[in-house]
Amino acid sequence: MPDTTMEPTKAKKVLIIEDEGDMCLLLNILLNGKEMELDHVKNLSAAKEYLLNEQPSVVILDNKLPDGFGVDFISIIKNAYPAIKIIMISGYDGSAKDVALENGADIFLEKPFTRDQLYQSIKGLMN
């Protein structure tokens, strides 16, 4: 007799690369309970190490980080893990949008953004 038990839907993994504690907390609050598993790291070095072991569906990437700029890290992610979708977030430099998109970011959100903008962006990339 076939097994008809339903396995729970596996949550999609989202990696947040953000060094500011308040912003990281806000992102966690905004996305909590949205059927996704959230992980976060505070710099690009930690992100590289994380990606060696885990491949999230989506990366939320801040631009200004302690050990470099997110816009420069986009092409590294895309070359090594082309299936990963990237949402670049930045509040410092609107001109980073063009560079981020040219380097392979799927979406650019300028801070401040709304909960709906963030959630709809992630949802759209996961479908």
Annotate each PLM feature.
Residues 18:
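Conserved acidic carboxylate
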Residues 21-39:
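Two-component/phosphorelay signaling modules centered on CheY-like receiver
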Residues 40-58:
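Acidic, metal-coordinating helix/loop segments flanking the phosphotransfer/catalytic sites
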Residues 43, 69-72:
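Acidic catalytic/metal-coordinating carboxylates
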Residues 62:
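Active-site residues of response regulator receiver
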Residues 72, 92-109:
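Alpha4 helix (beta4-alpha4-beta5 surface) of REC/receiver domains from two-component response regulators
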Residues 113-123:
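C-terminal output helix
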